């Protein structure tokens, strides 16, 4: 066995692991819980798992992702480097910290809470009542004596029945477990929180009445790449904390297919469940509790919106049938789940609500997002597009809805792009390029003066659209102009440099390559061809659309003009487009606060038709036609012109 020491560019504490001869650095890192970004799940195709060899030797051929200069400097792909001695390697920020760092939001400006406030108003206007069964009551009791020996549970039950006027009181195990201590520390003056339904009060938490904390709901959006969550006051709806972080499963692959393949290996289900629960949700929720200044026991309801595969892996359920014809998941919805069942940082007795799935590749994130978009409450035809790894689309109105997923891949969230990253600090989120000089102007996420680290989805859309507009690239995405920012490697592959090494925050060049552009063209082609096939299956075209709602966490917002220019969205009146942000998280927030919203989302799921694109005979033909800028049929995009 060899010793492998992982050091980190950001100065984090080194991790020491052991590796068997022939084991790759990526395999060793995974076993040691060292996060190295590997969107391709270690098959060598993405080039993102770069590490720097500081000491020792590894075996493995140099790949096209490592230049001669970088190879000489010690850079290796961890998936292609087999350990052959004791080694020390450095994991760069772009492969770890920038992709997985948790971030809590500043709620003081009001910008972060606007979508949630507006959602409550919109759903109420649509007839969805925003109320729930949670109540908290403050009670005082006589302290026991030698003459009054009534047990604590009976003493509490008696006063609760009188205070609430209910027929029956049930005390949860967490409540009873700490009851004796809380009663005596509080002088038998406590506040008890729980649900009141049909005359039965289910007590979930008891605390000192002089130390009040709100009853809280936890809403979570589990994306394939990014996980976002909020803590909200269950009675007022006030947002108490909001944050996000990378999905810890990312090191096992950027898309759901790679995750399913990994979970099929020995111990894979347990590894992937641990990655999402213990390595992602637990630390994120703890950070949110600290930000909100509430104890985890005060989280009394948890609502999760995620795709079908993420739901299965969250619960530790085999997801392999999802990818195998006829694509049948183990479940669409799951009732009776408690936070303690899956080790959530919350009151163990808190109900976990999973937004229902619709099909193998259209999950609860889309039903929650559809709830948010309110296309179900409109007479006119609307399109809802979620720009995530799966690329889900819903079309319809109050009379019917149809959904599909088009496997766009992780490009919209920076995956499969050589310098791609999530929309966190340092991400290039908007780009304009001068027609004559090809010099870029960049908008970067973060504080003033932030240097670029990589490029997120909205920035990728912009740079490809701008390169096409300025005639720097062809319809196939190949570079056709010469310029100081258009460079080529020894194999002739071109790249456009957004930031030279001395201009970036990492000291490395930030560029978009022809391979990146081709990858993104496939992703945008999947979106447009899915829209086209869905409408065609109903004998309709884009002329019927009156609203297009675009969701996803790919940046602060998409430049719709550029999205149309590259052929991702239909060339219709731009006033039809509305970017609605993380609609999945907003939907989970509604589920946390409203019993009626939970009923509504199940109704939406049961009434939505699922279109399986793989069975549509013309889909591949349409997809291939859409894999050009903007399309092989340029008549579909009259406004997309080159200068």
Q: For the regions a protein language model found, what residue spans apply to each?
A:
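Glycine-rich phosphate-binding loop of actin/hexokinase-like ATP-binding domains
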Residues: 220-224, 229-257, 321-334, 368, ...
């Amino acid at each position: 066995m060899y010793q492998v020491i992982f050091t980190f560019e950001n100065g984090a504490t080194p991790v020491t692991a052991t590796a068997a001869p022939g084991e790759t650095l990526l395999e060793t890192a995974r076993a040691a819980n060292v996060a190295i970004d590997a969107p391709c799940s270690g098959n060598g195709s993405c080039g993102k798992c770069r590490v720097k060899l500081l000491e020792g030797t590894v075996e493995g051929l140099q790949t096209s992702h490592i230049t001669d200069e970088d190879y000489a400097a010690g850079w290796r792909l961890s998936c292609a480097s087999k350990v052959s001695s004791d080694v020390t390697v450095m994991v760069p920020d772009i492969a770890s910290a920038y992709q997985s760092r948790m971030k809590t939001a500043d709620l003081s400006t009001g910008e972060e809470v606007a979508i949630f406030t507006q959602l409550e108003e919109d759903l109420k206007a649509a007839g969805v009542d925003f109320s729930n069964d949670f109540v908290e009551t403050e009670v005082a009791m006589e302290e026991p004596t030698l003459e009054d020996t009534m047990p604590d549970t009976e003493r509490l039950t008696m006063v609760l029945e009188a205070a609430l006027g209910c027929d029956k009181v049930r005390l949860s195990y967490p409540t009873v477990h700490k009851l004796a201590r809380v009663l005596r520390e509080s002088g038998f003056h406590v506040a008890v929180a729980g649900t009141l339904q049909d005359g039965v009060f289910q007590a979930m938490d008891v605390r000192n009445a002089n130390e009040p904390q709100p009853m809280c709901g936890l809403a979570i959006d589990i994306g394939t790449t990014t996980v976002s969550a909020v803590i909200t006051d269950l009675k007022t709806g006030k947002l108490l904390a909001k944050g996000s972080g990378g999905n810890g499963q990312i090191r096992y692959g950027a898309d759901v297919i790679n995750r399913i393949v990994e979970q099929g290996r020995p111990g894979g289900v347990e590894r992937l469940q641990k990655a999402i629960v213990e390595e992602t949700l637990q630390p994120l929720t703890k950070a949110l509790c600290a930000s909100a200044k509430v104890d985890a026991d005060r989280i009394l309801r948890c609502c999760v919106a995620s795709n079908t595969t993420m739901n299965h892996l969250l619960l530790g359920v085999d997801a392999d049938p999802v990818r195998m014809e006829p694509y049948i998941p183990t479940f669409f919805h799951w009732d009776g789940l408690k936070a303690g069942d899956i080790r959530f940082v919350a009151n163990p007795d808190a109900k976990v609500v999973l937004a229902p799935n619709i099909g193998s590749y259209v999950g609860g994130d889309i039903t929650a997002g559809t709830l948010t978009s309110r296309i179900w409450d409109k007479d006119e035809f609307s399109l809802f597009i979620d720009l995530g790894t799966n690329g889900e689309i819903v079309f319809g109105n109050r009379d019917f809805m149809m959904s599909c997923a088009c496997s766009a891949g992780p490009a919209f969230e920076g995956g499969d792009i050589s310098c791609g990253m999530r929309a966190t600090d340092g991400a290039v989120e908007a780009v304009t390029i001068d027609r004559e000089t090809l010099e870029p102007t960049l908008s970067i996420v973060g504080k003033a003066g932030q240097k670029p680290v990589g490029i997120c989805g909205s920035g990728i859309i912009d740079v490809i659209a701008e390169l096409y507009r300025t005639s720097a690239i062809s319809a196939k995405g190949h570079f056709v102009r010469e310029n100081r920012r258009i460079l080529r490697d020894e194999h002739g592959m071109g790249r456009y440099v957004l930031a030279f090494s001395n201009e970036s925050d990492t000291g490395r060049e930030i560029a978009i390559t022809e391979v990146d552009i081709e990858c993104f063209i496939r992703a945008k082609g999947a979106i447009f061809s899915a829209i086209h096939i869905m409408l065609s299956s109903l004998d309709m075209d884009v002329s019927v659309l009156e609203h297009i709602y675009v969701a996803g966490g790919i940046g602060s917002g998409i430049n719709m003009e550029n999205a149309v220019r590259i052929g991702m969205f239909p060339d219709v009146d731009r006033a039809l487009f509305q970017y609605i942000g993380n609609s999945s998280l907003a939907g989970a927030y509604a589920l946390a606060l409203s019993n009626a919203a939970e009923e509504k989302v199940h109704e939406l799921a049961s009434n939505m038709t699922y279109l399986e694109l793989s069975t549509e005979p013309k889909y591949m033909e349409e997809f291939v036609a859409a894999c050009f800028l903007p399309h092989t049929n340029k008549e579909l995009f009259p406004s997309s012109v080159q200068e």
